Amino acid sequence: MSEQLLTASTSIDAAPLSDNTVQTTAPATSKINLLDLNRQQMREFFAEMGEKPFRADQVMKWMYHYCYDDFEQMTDINKGLRAKLQRVAEIRAPEVAEEQRSVDGTIKWAIKVGDQQVETVYIPEADRATLCVSSQVGCALECKFCSTAQQGFNRNLRVSEIIGQVWRAAKIIGSLKSTGTRPITNVVMMGMGEPLLNLNNVVPAMDIMMDDFGFGLSKRRVTLSTSGVVPALDKLGDMIDVALAISLHAPTDDIRDEIVPINRKYNIETFLAAVRRYLDKSKANGGRVTVEYVMLDHINDSTEQAHQLAECLKDTPCKINLIPWNPFPGAPYGRSSNSRVDRFSKVLMEYGFTTIVRKTRGDDIDAACGQLAGEVIDRTKRTLKKKMAGEPIAIKTV
């Protein structure tokens, strides 16, 4: 597959795996939003109109290679087909409600999805530019150190609302090309929500990201991050091949049960076994998974816990990202000191693990890892205010 740069030239039970039901809002119009369709679906739609498959490919190229949303601008499409498309279809990406820019070049967009908002973050670096994309409005998993989790869960995003974040960002970044802004080269499903609880929408969206007539990204440049929804992870391996990152954050079940509550349903051993099964099928990961580990002061950052983590991961090929915790209002944690992070990292490297301390980006605009919140109407009725008033959070110190 050729790789094109992106430019404009609840509890777990509250958010099911979406095997049979996709939680969405109703479309704003009766027209088909072509951003909801991957290439196979697009060709089927065009066939229903009596058109040949290559016409669908042509339209996709205009949509994703050039970020056009007006059929009249698609000059190699005949006028009759353009008129037909105007009657029955549209290209409607979610709009930007607010944009914030960090001193380090990071850009955060609040994206309107119905009457709510999710957040999308553009992170430029010397050799790449990564877009962090949301998959749900809120999140049901209640990870205690994450701002999104404190908003509760409302619904899954549609395909058009997921790929639409990439489309909108690519269009904006393309317009900034003259300023030297780096085109998007990587997409990570690490924004608001648990992607594996929205497989029916996340998988087609990632398919479009990697399609030659879509955004044309390599499978190694599209990453899905999960906290450990094991049945859905097994299903993912049969549906698509992308890079995998896992939100581990603790070396033992007693700590992970507290800070990542889904661990009470799928413990570390069960989770890592599923990860190894995925790696056995995947070519996108180069044989190893990325382990994400947020550093919480005196919670999970002792040298003893570093040894425990090394033991925990000894049978799982991986590289480890140590993430400085990013604070949000009302959170009961502190960021690990540089000295504790350094000691933790050195222990892991002594065991032979590739270990990276992630540089915090966009924290001045609350765009850093764990800080995304958006605007969520909480269908699970779990808000930070209620938690702090009626459900004290148990914390172990080490």
Swiss-Prot record:
<dbReference type="GO" id="GO:0046872">
    <property type="term" value="F:metal ion binding"/>
</dbReference>
<dbReference type="InterPro" id="IPR040072">
    <property type="entry name" value="Methyltransferase_A"/>
</dbReference>
<feature type="binding site">
    <location>
        <begin position="247"/>
        <end position="249"/>
    </location>
    <ligand>
        <name>S-adenosyl-L-methionine</name>
    </ligand>
</feature>
<keyword id="KW-0819">tRNA processing</keyword>
<feature type="domain" description="Radical SAM core">
    <location>
        <begin position="125"/>
        <end position="364"/>
    </location>
</feature>
<feature type="binding site">
    <location>
        <begin position="193"/>
        <end position="194"/>
    </location>
    <ligand>
        <name>S-adenosyl-L-methionine</name>
    </ligand>
</feature>
<dbReference type="GO" id="GO:0070040">
    <property type="term" value="F:rRNA (adenine(2503)-C2-)-methyltransferase activity"/>
</dbReference>
<dbReference type="GO" id="GO:0000049">
    <property type="term" value="F:tRNA binding"/>
</dbReference>
<comment type="function">
    <text>Specifically methylates position 2 of adenine 2503 in 23S rRNA and position 2 of adenine 37 in tRNAs. m2A2503 modification seems to play a crucial role in the proofreading step occurring at the peptidyl transferase center and thus would serve to optimize ribosomal fidelity.</text>
</comment>
<dbReference type="GO" id="GO:0002935">
    <property type="term" value="F:tRNA (adenine(37)-C2)-methyltransferase activity"/>
</dbReference>
<keyword id="KW-0408">Iron</keyword>
<dbReference type="GO" id="GO:0070475">
    <property type="term" value="P:rRNA base methylation"/>
</dbReference>
<feature type="active site" description="S-methylcysteine intermediate">
    <location>
        <position position="369"/>
    </location>
</feature>
<dbReference type="GO" id="GO:0019843">
    <property type="term" value="F:rRNA binding"/>
</dbReference>
<keyword id="KW-0698">rRNA processing</keyword>
<keyword id="KW-0004">4Fe-4S</keyword>
<dbReference type="InterPro" id="IPR027492">
    <property type="entry name" value="RNA_MTrfase_RlmN"/>
</dbReference>
<protein>
    <recommendedName>
        <fullName>Dual-specificity RNA methyltransferase RlmN</fullName>
        <ecNumber>2.1.1.192</ecNumber>
    </recommendedName>
</protein>
<keyword id="KW-0949">S-adenosyl-L-methionine</keyword>
<dbReference type="InterPro" id="IPR013785">
    <property type="entry name" value="Aldolase_TIM"/>
</dbReference>
<keyword id="KW-0479">Metal-binding</keyword>
<feature type="binding site">
    <location>
        <position position="326"/>
    </location>
    <ligand>
        <name>S-adenosyl-L-methionine</name>
    </ligand>
</feature>
<dbReference type="InterPro" id="IPR048641">
    <property type="entry name" value="RlmN_N"/>
</dbReference>
<feature type="binding site">
    <location>
        <position position="143"/>
    </location>
    <ligand>
        <name>[4Fe-4S] cluster</name>
    </ligand>
</feature>
<keyword id="KW-0411">Iron-sulfur</keyword>
<comment type="similarity">
    <text>Belongs to the radical SAM superfamily. RlmN family.</text>
</comment>
<feature type="binding site">
    <location>
        <position position="146"/>
    </location>
    <ligand>
        <name>[4Fe-4S] cluster</name>
    </ligand>
</feature>
<feature type="binding site">
    <location>
        <position position="225"/>
    </location>
    <ligand>
        <name>S-adenosyl-L-methionine</name>
    </ligand>
</feature>
<keyword id="KW-0489">Methyltransferase</keyword>
<feature type="active site" description="Proton acceptor">
    <location>
        <position position="119"/>
    </location>
</feature>
<keyword id="KW-0808">Transferase</keyword>
<dbReference type="InterPro" id="IPR004383">
    <property type="entry name" value="rRNA_lsu_MTrfase_RlmN/Cfr"/>
</dbReference>
<dbReference type="Pfam" id="PF21016">
    <property type="entry name" value="RlmN_N"/>
</dbReference>
<dbReference type="GO" id="GO:0051539">
    <property type="term" value="F:4 iron, 4 sulfur cluster binding"/>
</dbReference>
<dbReference type="Pfam" id="PF04055">
    <property type="entry name" value="Radical_SAM"/>
</dbReference>
<dbReference type="GO" id="GO:0005737">
    <property type="term" value="C:cytoplasm"/>
</dbReference>
<keyword id="KW-1015">Disulfide bond</keyword>
<feature type="binding site">
    <location>
        <position position="139"/>
    </location>
    <ligand>
        <name>[4Fe-4S] cluster</name>
    </ligand>
</feature>
<keyword id="KW-0963">Cytoplasm</keyword>
<dbReference type="InterPro" id="IPR007197">
    <property type="entry name" value="rSAM"/>
</dbReference>
<feature type="disulfide bond" description="(transient)">
    <location>
        <begin position="132"/>
        <end position="369"/>
    </location>
</feature>
<dbReference type="GO" id="GO:0030488">
    <property type="term" value="P:tRNA methylation"/>
</dbReference>
